[in-house]
Regions:
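Metal-dependent phosphoesterase/phosphodiesterase active-site architecture
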Residues: 2-126, 183-283
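Active-site-proximal segments of metal-dependent phosphoesterases and phosphodiesterases across multiple
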Residues: 102-116, 126-176
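Conserved active-site segments centered on acidic
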Residues: 179
Length: 283
């Protein structure tokens, strides 16, 4: 399919500016170019699935792998139609996983009132444990407050409101997220000397394709350290195009990401967004 620069810009602007959350413009775009498209053989393995299907798949013992069952999700999530949950990281650290996807459309996020209230309650109920919060979206990309079609009367809440809740609980150490495909570490201060770190990590799709290991350490001097170590793939830097093994394909994905036309070279972030020791006061 060949499109003009003007058509491509119009489509990209609609996506970026969230002016077409229902995809009407995209539908019209595809219709206008119907003659240059090709039919794809149907395959049930590519069939769209609902949130309920997604949860059921996680709860299916056939997909347990190394576990745990549900990988965080439970039958309670399936019954309530929710995709947020809490889990125990260690005896004195709880993990809280938020669902920041807005089903109302667009790629930016938010959370509903019920989830915000659940977050507040979960932090209060676990006030004697340190808390690490996880989500897909960053605080700055939670700007989409379109109503959830499944809960049309429920208000949506942005990143600033989530920060306000997290900052009001002294047991919150970090908010770990992604979405922006870039390594960024942001401090958040609150009254009473409270603070926490927002740790955003880049994507495996884009160069430099780094993962991050986060470790919590009690320094035994009234402080805690959060280490944010980035790790690199062990795949070769150069590709052997005849090698279709797991290692060979991993090498290919590294080479393709590095040579992607127009790819950003700033996604690794600055030095203070990568391998750091982030210190917090205990208490």
């Amino acid at each position: 399919m060949n499109v003009t620069a003007a058509e491509a810009k119009k489509l990209q602007d609609a996506i970026k500016n969230a002016t077409d959350p229902k995809g009407v413009g995209y539908r019209d775009f595809l219709k206008a170019h119907a003659r240059s498209t090709h039919s794809v053989t149907p395959d049930e393995k590519r069939a769209p699935y609902t949130c309920a299907d997604y949860l059921k798949a996680h709860l299916d013992p056939a997909h347990q792998g190394h576990g745990p069952v549900g990988h965080g999700y439970s039958s309670a999530n399936l019954d309530a139609g929710t995709q947020y949950y809490a889990f125990r990281i260690s005896d004195d650290v709880i993990g809280i996983s938020l669902d920041t996807t807005d089903a109302g459309g667009h790629y930016e996020g938010s959370i509903g009132t019920a989830q915000l209230a659940w977050l507040e309650k979960t932090l209060k109920d676990n006030k004697d444990s340190y808390a690490v919060v996880f989500s897909h979206h960053t605080s700055k990309t939670m700007t989409n407050t379109r109503p959830d079609p499944a809960r049309p009367g429920e208000r949506r809440h942005d990143g600033a409101e989530v920060i306000s809740v997290l900052a009001s609980h002294g047991n919150v150490l970090a908010w770990v997220n992604g979405h922006i495909h870039k390594n960024v570490i942001t401090p958040h201060k609150a009254s009473g000397g409270r603070s926490f770190w927002e740790i955003s990590t880049a994507s495996h799709v884009d160069y430099p394709q780094l993962a991050r290991v986060i470790e919590l350490v009690d320094n035994k001097d009234g402080t805690l350290s959060v280490f944010t170590t980035l790790i690199e793939s062990a795949a070769p830097h150069r590709t052997d195009f005849a090698d279709l093994s797991q290692t060979g394909l991993a090498a290919l994905y590294r080479e393709l990401s590095y040579n992607a036309p127009g790819a950003s070279k700033t996604l690794a972030g600055n030095a203070d967004d990568r391998n750091t020791e982030l210190v917090l006061k205990k208490g």
